[in-house]
Amino acid sequence: MNSGNKVYIWEQDDWPHWRFDSVRLDGLLDQVRRSQERLLDRMHGIGVGLRDQANLRILTEDVLKSSEIEGEHLNPDSVRSSIARRLGVEIGALVPADRHVDGVVDMVLDATQNYRKNLTAERLFGWHAALFPTGYSGLTRIRIGAWRDDATGPMQVVSGPQGRQKVHYEAPPANRLDIEIADFLLWFNVDQQADPVIRAGLAHLWFVTVHPFDDGNGRIARAIGDMALTRAEQSTQRFYSLSAQIQRERKNYYDMLERTQKGTLEVTDWLEWFLGCLLRAIQGTEETLAVVLAKAEFWKNWAGIPMNERQIKLLNRLLDGFEGKLTSSKWASIAKCSPDTALRDITDLLDRGVLIRSGAGGRSTCYELKPQV
């Protein structure tokens, strides 16, 4: 219980000395580790190109969902193109750059691709500036690349209409931020006592509790958590999205944060929720990766069949979810070949049992993948 008028966790005398029951968390932590290992083993068995596609899908989902948690909806095609451009993944035509999307992507990629580098105040300032390239959050000008100064009052997390707002949390005053962040960064970069996955949960909670910026704290906290998880796995490729799972459990996420931030430094409940959410993220990634895994299975089944580059390109388009119906004229247009060559390519795949005909025949004849048994 809190004593006196100490409402928030950072007001406690023992702040920021986190405590948790390792024994209570051991079973869940073991499930998380085993699920991580199984997923990584499975992904390492599908080939480099498909792993890159899986990584692209997950990073795209991570960027989209981390922003959605804060009520911001980004263009999926812009996010996917921005990530593909930076990682050098071939996805066909790229959508024109959007500097706001590029900034969010830059932060997420810096956290996961450069996870071995120390996290510093300057690096955090860079992430914050990338999130708000115009210097505004909506219509409000905010301090960019600098800690908040509380010029308009204490930093509060509120909900409800103006005049009847409910205060869910109030962060430490601005004059404490240099010390607060210095303590956090020292722990994050140096202290290796806690399990790496536990550290991810603590880092997320600690940063969002300090709430050092005018805006963007949640997204940066989740990027820091992803950075810690990437360190735990020692891999720059991501095959599950914790942010996507948090978005699915958004109400529970905010309820657990509020309860923890108004509690003591004993944070086993928070870590139990975090580990459970992480486990559900790993176990639920099948849906997101279904297309990539289906492609892997398809090419495994047809590995012994010689195909030309045009056939491989068009089959991959079908596997990725071709919009509309694939006709011989569309084949010729996409593959940049003559109608006769397109028809020979298609006939060859029909004879081998890779494709089947559909449609009414004649000019309306179209082709699709033969269902795999």
Question: At which residue positions do the language-model features occur?
Answer:
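FIC/Doc superfamily catalytic core
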Residues: 1-373
